[in-house]
Every structure is written in structure tokens, then in C-alpha cells.
Amino acid sequence: MTRCDVLVVGGTHGNEINGAWLVDQWRDQHDLLDAAGLSLALEIGNPEARTANRRYVDRDLNRCFTADLLNQGGQEQELQRARQLLAWHGPDGATPCRVALDLHSTTAAMGSCLVVYGRRPADLALAARVQGALGLPIYLHEADAAQTGFLVEQWPCGLVIEVGPVPQGVLDALVVRQTRIALETCCQELAAARAGTGRDPHNLVVHRHLGSVDLPRDQRDCAAAMVHPQLQGQDWRPLMDGAAMFELPRGGTVPLQADEGETWPLFINEAAYAEKRIAFSLTRREVWPIDPSWGQALEQLMG
């Protein structure tokens, strides 16, 4: 069995074209990407949706990777693609990969950041070391039963690289550059883990998911307010209870009443989340000490 170090996926969402464009370029010109000596498998996540310039054809591919969905025999296009990616590069696939890196973009003002799902030690080690190298903020998404089935969770280690803002379907040179830098840094840290030369930062700063907030709804179940101008574009900035959250049609304000103290909103007004009834997500900023077992798990995986 031939093994591969890293699965790199672009275009998991078909209208997020920057990561997919990079995958195309790297396939044609291998020297454009410094993989730090690692072997890569490069895949377009959802080719059919990319051709149609849509997020997905039948359902969100990045919510398809749950055991129930994968095993129930559904024939929706994205379920078939999820099974195919696992058959090719999953832990038990024809060419299994140790790590999955999923390239995404967002219409929200998230900058360049990492998304981690749950608290797997190898994930935390890689995220911490990339944060130490680049200073990227980290969104820790966990404990949300409404949002599950993410691609990278099916691999022993995996992160999402998220860059924005950029409109859907728009190729943006800065987004491409930031995505490449983050990916190359991930590869460098994985190679260092293999060599036993990886260095942990003093701590890990995460923004831990608390929950998501929908727009107010009217009797027709339609949006009855908008994200407030004072909140728009303020991703990664603290928000206190009572702060302006939504603006009503006549100019009134709906304040935040989360009873959570200081929270940090993310993915504010992300276009793709309107169908999921998410105007933004609330997080809490936390600083964690580095657990040596994280790095040990990553080194064992890459050894």
C-alpha cells in the first residue's frame, strides 16, 4: 500500500474558487508549492459544484462526513464524493493520507485563520505550531450538534485553512497568497514533527465556539432585521452584552443579550450561512497551556 503524508483539498465548496485554483496550479507546476519534502495528494473536493459555481449540488459536502450519512447508502452527489475521497485517501483507502488540510474562503472578514474541530491532540499540536509561526487566530468548533460531518474529521489529523473576505466565485490574489503561506507553514511544521525538531509556542490561543445566532424572524419566517453596521466586519473583536447586534427596518437596534460576558463573534454575515440560519457565531477567547502530549501525538503520526 502506498501512503501519502497530506491530503490537500480545494473546492470543497464549489464557489470557493481560490483553493481550487491553487490545487490546479500545483498539479501543473509542482515547484510552486514548498511541501517541505512531504508527499501530497491534491484533490478538488466537489468538481461538479465547482463547474456550476455553486456551493454544492445536492447537499453541503463539508457536512457529509458522518458515519450515519456515509453508511446509509444515499446517492446524493456529495455523499458519493465523500465516499470516493475516503476510498482514495482515507485512513483505510487505496492511498491513505495521515493529514487532511482543507482550503476554504469566506465572505466574512475573518482574515487568514485556522479552524479546528474538537480537541484531538495532533490537531492541537499542528494548530499551535502554525499559530506560533504565523500568529493566525484559531476557531475551535466543538459541541454543536447542528453542525457536524466536517471533512477533516475523518483523517487522523486535519485543519481547515480559512481566508477572507472574498466574494463567492471571485479569484483574489491576496487570498491565494495567504492560503499558500498557511498551507506551506502547515507542511513545514509537519515535516519538523517528523524530524523531531518541532517547537511548541508558550501557549495556544483559541476562540472556542459557544453557539450561533440567527437573524430575527417575522411571522413569515423571513429575516426581520440586518446585521448592525457596527458589528459588520468586526470578526475576532470582543463584543459585550448590550452591544448593537441587529438593525431593524426603521433603524431600531436589537442588542446582544447572550449572558455570556465578553464574547467574540466570527463568520459575521457569511453569505453561505444564511441558509443555515446563522448570522454569526459567538466564541470565547481562551489561552491554553501547551500539553506535551499534543506534540508527541503529532510526531507519532508523522513518524
UniProtKB/Swiss-Prot annotation:
Signal peptide: none annotated. GO terms for cellular component: cytosol. Its EC number is 3.5.1.15. The keyword Zinc applies. One of its GO terms (molecular function) is aspartoacylase activity. Pfam families: AstE_AspA_cat, AstE_AspA_hybrid. It catalyses: an N-acyl-L-aspartate + H2O = a carboxylate + L-aspartate. Keywords: Hydrolase, Metal-binding, Zinc. Its cofactor is Zn(2+). It comes from the Bacteria. It is an enzyme of class 3 (hydrolase). Binds 1 zinc ion per subunit. Zn(2+) binds at H13, E16, H104. Substrate binds at R55, N62, R63, E162, Y273. Belongs to the AspA/AstE family. Aspartoacylase subfamily. This is Probable aspartoacylase.
